[in-house]
From Swiss-Prot:
Key words of the record: Periplasm, Signal
Subcellular localization, as worded in the UniProt entry: Periplasm
InterPro entries, A to Z: Acid_shock
Listed Low complexity bias regions: 74-83, 94-103
Region (Disordered): 40-121
Protein name as annotated: Acid shock protein
Function summary: Required for growth and/or survival at acidic conditions.
Entry superkingdom: Bacteria
Length: 121
């Protein structure tokens, strides 16, 4: 930005000095007009040129291209864990078939008995 401003100031000072020189030296009228034309052409050329900014190579990589080197951290086992963090390991126990079932688990096969009519006496 500062370079562009400096170029603009230099161009305006250059034009004003050429115009001042053309006004003071009236004897060299053809030479003064040719110099103002060349200076005007140069200023137009400098105004339309884009200055290339040299970018420094950044060492920025894409997130996926970064190599994550994880160091193997040695963690000691915590002495006490929270209740929710405890792992419940249930061992598979061999169950034998129960000899006697509970009363509610028994299957009741009741046959409906008809009431026996008592003889009339």
């Amino acid at each position: 930005m500062k370079k562009v401003l400096a170029l603009m100031v230099a161009a305006t000072l250059g034009l004003s000095s050429v115009a001042f020189a053309a006004d003071t030296t009236a004897t060299a009228t053809p030479a003064a007009t040719s110099t103002t034309a060349t200076v005007a052409a140069q200023t137009k050329a400098t105004q339309h040129q884009k200055h290339k900014v040299t970018k420094k190579t950044t060492e920025q990589k894409a997130q996926a291209a970064k190599k994550h080197e994880k160091k193997a951290s040695v963690q000691k086992a915590p002495v006490q864990k929270a209740q929710a963090a405890k792992k419940h390991v249930k061992k598979a126990s061999v169950q034998k078939a129960p000899v006697q079932k509970a009363q509610a688990a028994k299957k009741h096969h009741k046959t409906a008995k008809k009431p026996v009519a008592a003889p009339a006496a």
